[in-house]
Amino acid sequence: MKGLCVAACTLVLAAATPLTPRENTCTQGSKTPYGALTHSACPCWNWYEIQTGDGDCGKVASKFGVSREDVIRVEPGRVTPPNPLPTPPCNAADAPYPVGKGTVCGCKKWYRIRRGDDCGPVASEFGISADQLIEWNPWLSADVDGTHYPCMNIWPTDNLCVDVSSF
């Protein structure tokens, strides 16, 4: 979900051996791409960079001969059914790319996420609440195994709507 379908994000696919996510239990190797989630299956031996046109996780999974469910199991934070990949926003021909699926229509101001950003500080910078930021950019949140994680999917190079004042 980290802005899936853009070159800056990555998706983990475990090689042959089924793995389950284990947060903070090991350190990924030196070839771990920037943007890998801390709760990705660990250790991971194969990394895949999402390409424009990859579609959803099922299409990517089929490239590696695994099921969509396998991808979800090793990379739970990347996937929220039914289609986790971002699409261009409605009514915003001038919107930057990438913009996550479900971004509010008619956004008046955009912010490009930088490394180290988090929802609270970004929202404060633009005089809005973190709840407003997430409401306008719902793809920031994820539900994993019944637990809701607000602002889990804030990834560098993705774009956030930070103002709908004239909307």
Swiss-Prot record:
Gene Ontology molecular function, alphabetical: chitin binding
Disulfide bonds: none
Induction statement: Expressed during in vivo infection of insect hosts.
Keywords from the UniProt entry: Chitin-binding, Signal, Virulence
Domain of life, per lineage: Eukaryota
SUPFAM superfamilies per UniProt: LysM domain
Phenotype of the disrupted gene, per the record: Does not affect virulence to host insects.
Signal peptide span: 1-16
Residue ranges of every copy of the LysM domain listed in the record: 109-162
Anything else known: In plants, chitin acts as a microbe-associated molecular pattern (MAMP) that is recognized by lysin motif (LysM)-containing plant cell surface-localized pattern recognition receptors (PRRs) that activate a plethora of downstream immune responses.
UniProt function note: Might have a role in sequestration of chitin oligosaccharides (breakdown products of fungal cell walls that are released during invasion and act as triggers of host immunity) to dampen host defense.
Record remark on domains: The LysM (lysin motif) domains are small globular domains involved in binding chitin in eukaryotes. Blys6 contains one5 LysM domain.
Family: Belongs to the secreted LysM effector family.
Protein name: Secreted LysM effector Blys6
Gene (UniProt): Blys6
